[in-house]
């Protein structure tokens, strides 16, 4: 196996693992975009960005294409609901943001920026895991005046 093959395998594997860690957290939380979705997004982004690295194509165009495609995918994950009494609620923003970050991690892995992958993955997991209870605490103890009570509890994880 040549060095090029090994390097490509390592880069794609790093994209899959980093994306999988984030997807696992989303799966645990009962989100629709979970483990496999995040892994596929990360790998797909890594594949698209790695293609121009081997030739003369402009890598920035590949990055722009991934960003556009991920924007459409994330938009499909966001749901705007109209509730009773004229209340409105938006769901899926965190999942959409985690998909967007996953794509970025895949692109970063494709170019071999290992420190960025590690810091980005750890930072994302800290935000998703550590900030979840902080967000719940803030919503319960410092509610915004224009947010209906029913929507304040929407950050609670689904019960099994």
Model regions and ranges:
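Alpha-helical transmembrane segments and their membrane-interface exit regions
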Residues: 69-76, 123-133
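Hydrophobic alpha-helical segments embedded in the membrane of multi-pass proteins
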Residues: 39-46, 64-75, 96-100
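An accessory alpha-helical subdomain
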Residues: 142-144
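Generic transmembrane alpha-helix signature in multi-pass membrane proteins
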Residues: 48-52, 74-84, 101-113
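Structural signal for the N-terminal portions of transmembrane helices
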Residues: 88-130
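Alpha-helical transmembrane-segment detector that highlights a single hydrophobic TM helix
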Residues: 57-87
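Short, amphipathic, aromatic/basic-enriched membrane-interface segments that mark the entry/exit
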Residues: 29-36, 82-94
């Amino acid at each position: 196996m040549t060095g090029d093959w090994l390097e490509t395998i390592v880069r794609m594997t790093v994209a899959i693992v980093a994306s999988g860690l984030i997807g696992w957290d989303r799966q645990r939380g009962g989100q629709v975009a979970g483990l496999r979705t995040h892994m596929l997004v990360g790998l797909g982004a890594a594949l698209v960005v790695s293609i121009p690295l081997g030739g003369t194509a402009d890598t920035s165009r590949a990055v722009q294409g991934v960003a556009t495609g991920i924007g459409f995918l994330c938009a499909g994950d966001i749901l705007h609901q109209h509730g009773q009494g004229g209340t409105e609620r938006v769901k899926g923003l965190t999942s959409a943001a985690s998909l967007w970050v996953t794509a970025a991690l895949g692109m970063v892995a494709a170019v071999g920026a290992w420190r960025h992958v590690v810091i980005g993955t750890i930072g994302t997991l800290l935000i998703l895991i550590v900030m979840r209870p902080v967000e719940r605490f803030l919503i319960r103890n410092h509610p915004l005046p224009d947010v209906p009570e029913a929507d304040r509890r929407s950050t609670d994880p689904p019960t099994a």
